[in-house]
Amino acid sequence: MDIKRALILFLLFLVVLSNAFVDYIISNFNHAVTCRKPTYFGIVLQGIFLVILFSIADYLINENIL
């Protein structure tokens, strides 16, 4: 993994685990957030979002768009 992919992965990790992401995205799913903290289901959703976003970013890097 080159430095660009590692940096993108780190930034996506920070975004997906941020309070704003939990409050505005994850909280829209039923039983994913309790007391502004993700439940086990919410944590799984965060992982799924991280994988999807990193796959998109990896594709964009491979196509020299990023």
UniProtKB/Swiss-Prot annotation:
The keyword Metal-binding does not apply. It is a single-pass type I membrane protein. It is found in: Host membrane. Keywords: Host membrane, Membrane, Signal, Transmembrane, Transmembrane helix. Residues 62-66 are cytoplasmic. It comes from the Viruses. Residues 1-20 form the signal peptide. The keyword Transmembrane applies. Belongs to the asfivirus B66L family. This is Transmembrane protein B66L. It comes from African swine fever virus (isolate Pig/Kenya/KEN-50/1950).
